[in-house]
Each structure stands twice: as C-alpha cells, then as structure tokens.
C-alpha cells in the first residue's frame, strides 16, 4: 500500500508514538487485524512510530504481517527505547549498554541477579532469566521461555507478592553507584539500563523533525512502569490505555478515524 508523504497528511506536524506490549498488542502476542487497519488509517493523517524495550526482532514478530518489514509500517521505529532507531526505513546511530557500563560491573550485576533468582520461591521457573540487549538487560524471575499460560500465572502471583518490585528495590540499593534505572514492564520482567536511557531516549531522534505535537500511548504509565518517563515528559501529550482495544477506541475518538 502506498504511503502518503508526511507533508501531505492532514496533520503533518503531529507525531503519535506507541508502546508495543499492552498498547498495540497483547503482551508478546501478535497485532490484530483491527489494530493494523486503525494504524493504517491513522498514518494517513499523522506521522506514527513505536517505541518498545525489546529488540527489533521481537517487535518484528509482533507487529509484522505477511512478512512485511515492520520498519516500513511506521514512520519511526524505536527498538530498545530508541537505542536502535529507524526513520523512514533508514537506521540511525545506536548505543551500547555493555560499552557504557563495562564488563567488570556488568558481570557483578548479572551474577548477583542470578543468585537472587536462584533463591526465589515462585510457582515455576523456566529459562532465559537474563536477556542481554544492545541498550539494556531484561531480567525475568520466571524466565522469558515461559509459555503464555505460565506468564499469566506469574503475573497474577507477582501482583500479590511483588516479586519484581521487591527485586528492583534490592538492586537499586545494591548497585546505587552504577547510574542505572530499573523499570518494570510487561507481565514477567523488568529492564535495567543507564539513567536517561528510558523511552524518553527516543525523543532526541524526533526533536528536530519539526513536530508541534507528540502524542504517546502506553499502558505502564504509573511511576515505576516503563512508560512513565515518556508519559510525563513535557515534550509529549501522554495517554494511558489499558489494552489494545482501548488504544483503538482512544485513537478513533481523538483523531476521528
């Protein structure tokens, strides 16, 4: 489908950014046909982009249809909070977590986390407790290999026992001199990245693009959630949603699409 050039859209000075999990798709699941249609209609009137903590391959799995490259479906694609960034299909400069932190500190952090998780008493443990990404590490007490049913079970358990929140508090104190941010997101994990490398990082890529208005839609907009910083940032108009259906309803109401 041909894409209308931004300057020919109804609101060429407006950018709408989206979180992925819980906003455009159910957590770690694929985008719905209704959401895709809504985004296509929205792209006719404004510029659109996504910003997620996962690497681009995971966002490709969730947002791509029929093998289409996800970076072609959005004007801006920000993986790992914008540390891997694309503008109109062209990659921008990237950053590296490991180069910033250093191997020695990184290993101390990882070793502590693995020992901590080993001692946790939770219903199930699977695999991939720590996932290394370009701009952060993702830590999951249950393991990212958990299936959908196990993820749902852990999410319910975590709401009552505060497994992730407690671990984050411990890490903040233990590694307070590392200059790190700990941010809970999704169902089963939390992200660890340098202070300032939250989702607001992506805004540096669009600040000089001439937008008058930048909307952001996210579901983890509470303090400590991984959408909070960009949600409250003065450069954006934040919208808190509960699920993809809520996102669609809000978009139709705001942009009359």
From Swiss-Prot:
InterPro entries found in the cross-reference section: HAD-like_sf, HAD-SF_hydro_IIB, HAD_sf, PMM, PMM_cap
One GO CC annotation: cytosol
Residues annotated to bind Mg(2+) 1: 19, 21, 219
Any matching Pfam family: PMM
Protein EC: 5.4.2.8
Enzyme class: isomerase
Active-site residue numbers: 19 (nucleophile), 21 (proton donor/acceptor)
List of residues binding alpha-D-mannose 1-phosphate: 28, 133, 144, 151, 189, 191
Highest taxon in the source lineage: Eukaryota
Catalysed reactions, semicolon-separated: alpha-D-mannose 1-phosphate = D-mannose 6-phosphate
GO MF annotations, alphabetized: metal ion binding; phosphomannomutase activity
Similarity comment: Belongs to the eukaryotic PMM family.
Quaternary state and interactors: Homodimer.
Protein name in UniProt: Phosphomannomutase
Lineage, uppermost ranks: Eukaryota, Fungi, Dikarya, Ascomycota, Taphrinomycotina
